[in-house]
Design a protein with these regions (language model features):
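S-adenosyl-L-methionine
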Residues: 2-60, 70-78
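Mobile, glycine- and charge-enriched loop segments
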Residues: 48-62, 227-232, 237-239, 258-276, ...
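Conserved proline-anchored active-site loop of SAM-dependent methyltransferases
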Residues: 61-75, 85-89, 175, 225-246, ...
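Short catalytic/ligand-binding loop motif for oxyanion handling, primarily in non-cytosolic enzymes
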Residues: 72-73, 92-94, 177-181, 240-243, ...
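Class I S-adenosyl-L-methionine-dependent methyltransferase module
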Residues: 82-84, 88-205, 244-278, 283-284
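Conserved SAM/SAH-binding loop
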Residues: 217-222
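Conserved Class I SAM-dependent methyltransferase catalytic core
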Residues: 274-330
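Class I S-adenosyl-L-methionine
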Residues: 315-361
Length: 361
């Protein structure tokens, strides 16, 4: 069942400062409060109103391209009894487990740990894996990078004393806190040359425990074969931008395998590459659609079919997408004007979000 006891008695929703330490913000932030390309938070109402119109009696929901988890979280908020959510990127999986995954956690224990971290004097910290790879005025200023690395190492030290849920919560707190101060436009493909360092603050998150959530980590085309759901919501990568590269840094912080990184922008040797961001996208989509066991398929895409910038041009054309989906049932299309978050790299005008609605035969 849902645990809604979020707030800690005696802690006001404001920064608890410790002089030269790290401020602790006790106002909880939500799963969608993260910079991420394709984040559907602002589209949730529109998406679920369209779902309600045709499938108002549905009780199960599957999101095999979960991203931040904002859509899966909204499905839970709207009363779906069973929610399946999947992604391939470790940072997203850690977030799902922290924010919506089942499990027990102790609020006071989490806050005690945060307040101990709040006493850290960053100037006293030694160099570590994070500062060596992501500090030195690149993704983070040097002292912030040292603090991130120290805290991540401390989570591993504390792990024997934590429940699995508490472990994920602490990592998610670090993940969302560092995202607020990263010296980037929102992805971690590269860092800004003009420094805009902000004060690093530890921010409490809003964890819930749902028994009806099932979390997967794998290729959407593989995991979908074992799932039966009233609704399958598809939000595949639209264009050539590879999420495995864009979010390699948070993945490395979450996994903490201390892999040797390469290049000026400090990347793994082999980041995950999605076929949906290549010329194979249509073939992958057709394969996925044929494997789905559901009553309804809702597919998000946008209208960047002829964009001048190849990086944001859709890999699957409108007619091709419609043809693929129509093989499983009658398909209609809803549309909404929408300017997506794109990390500031490309100016997009006249953008519309599309929702393909397929009633499976």
């Amino acid at each position: 069942m849902l645990d809604k006891n979020l707030f800690i008695p005696g802690f006001e929703p404001e920064a608890q400062g410790y002089g030269s330490g790290i401020p602790v913000i006790t106002t909880p932030i939500n799963i969608n409060n993260r910079r991420y390309i394709g984040n559907k938070t602002k589209l949730n109402n529109w998406i679920f109103e369209n779902i309600k119109k045709v499938a108002g009696d549905a009780i199960s929901f599957c999101d095999p391209f979960g991203g931040t988890g904002a859509v899966a979280n909204e499905a839970l908020n709207r009363g779906f009894k069973k929610v399946f959510v999947n992604d391939v990127l470790p940072a997203n999986i850690y977030s799902y487990n922290a924010f919506i995954g089942p499990g027990k956690w102790n609020k006071s224990k989490i806050m005690d740990i945060l307040n101990e971290w709040g006493k850290i004097n960053k100037k006293d910290l030694d160099e570590n894996y994070c500062s060596m790879n992501y500090g030195h005025e690149t993704y983070f200023d040097e002292l912030t990078a040292r603090a991130i690395g120290y805290i991540r190492e401390d989570i591993e030290r504390l792990r024997p004393m934590l429940t699995e849920k508490e472990y994920y919560i602490l990592i998610a707190i670090l993940l969302y806190s560092m995202d607020k101060v990263a010296n980037t436009t929102g992805t971690y493909d590269s860092y800004l040359k003009i420094k805009n360092h902000k004060e690093f603050k530890l921010r409490m998150i809003s964890p819930y425990s749902y028994d009806g959530v099932k979390i997967y980590q794998g290729d959407a085309n593989d995991i979908i074969k074992g799932i039966e759901s009233d609704i399958v919501y598809l939000d595949p990568p639209y264009n050539s931008r590879q999420y495995g590269r864009l979010y390699n840094l948070p993945d490395k912080i979450c996994k903490w395998d201390k892999e040797e990184l390469e290049g000026k922008t400090a990347k793994s040797r082999n980041t995950f590459r999605s076929k949906y961001s290549t010329r194979m996208a249509a073939k992958e989509m057709r394969d996925l659609i044929n494997k789905i066991n559901a009553k309804w398929i809702f597919t998000s895409y946008n209208n960047n079919f002829n964009a001048k910038d190849a990086r944001v041009r859709n890999k699957i054309g409108y007619d091709e997408m419609l043809d693929i989906l129509s093989t499983r049932g009658d398909t209609s299309v809803a549309e909404m004007p929408y300017n997506p978050y794109n990390a500031g790299r490309t100016k997009i005008t006249g953008n519309k979000e599309l929702l393909f609605i397929t009633r499976v035969r």
